Amino acid sequence: GNGSNSGHVRVYEWDNSSWTQIGNDIDGEAAEDQSGISVSLSSDGSIVAIGAGDNDGNGDNSGHVRVYEWDNTSWTQLGGDIDGEAAGDYSGYSVSLSSDGTIVAIGAPVNDNYSGHVRVYQWDNTSWTQIGDDIDGEAANDFSGISVSMSSDGSIVAIGAGDNDGNGDNSGHVRVYEWDNTSWTQLGGDIDGEAAGDYSGQSVSISSDGSIVAIGAKYNSGNGISSGNVRVYEWDDSSWNQLGSDIDGEAAGDLSGHSVSLRSDGSIVAIGAYGNDGNGNLSGHVRVYEWNNTSWTQIGDDIDGEAADDQSGHSVSLSSDGSFVAIGAL
């Protein structure tokens, strides 16, 4: 729309019979920006944050995020671009908005020798101002900020670092931080991946109150090599405890957990497995599970991709009540 691989975002509304686009395409700034690599909507759908990890606003591939508001006529940018710190940061690779759209968390997984960081900004009706310091990854090559998910009020943020080595090379981990009106303080310990090579934390989703977090580990081999899994944890005011057993992918190579999305209260989770072959090679699928206070039980059948090579489940998003699911297929 604005040059080769500039990228764009389209927003659609359901009118009880069909999906109708709201406003025009929201185009990336320039060629090769890959705008739309990440996207997050406010709860009422009137504000959207869009990541463009390859944007060059602060150096080659520094990345940026733009936030737009719907004024009943068009999408208007709120404030200026939120640029990455430095060249090569790929800031905007992940993004998450608070429910009212006034706070945004932005992942830059390649910052500072691939340790990665997350920055959180608040809208003051004039500009986007950073809240607290950068939330840096633990070590070089952690890729912290590859995924990010924020509580409804923006006070708690879960950050995935899929390449962290806390439980073996590239086992991955998630850290959860809370804003105490002065700084971002980690809640509990690291939530480490199960084993080396799991890349746990490449996807993450947190409940609206920040007390439940779902973590994808698509290379976990609990049900065959790279079957993938999702683990769900609950905060008990002192530590993170796993809810139920691992939710394993169906078969080897499924890469289940590449995408994950929780219902607002954390009781339902949608899981994307774009490598699944249920409707042809790499057709992909999504499974939805509900917590029954004892275990995670699948709701309904697999939601299979339309055809071979669709890689359906590459992205997934649940509505707040868990009754609707949006599924991306490459």
Where do the language-model regions lie?
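Conserved beta-strand/short-helix segments
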Residues: 1-330
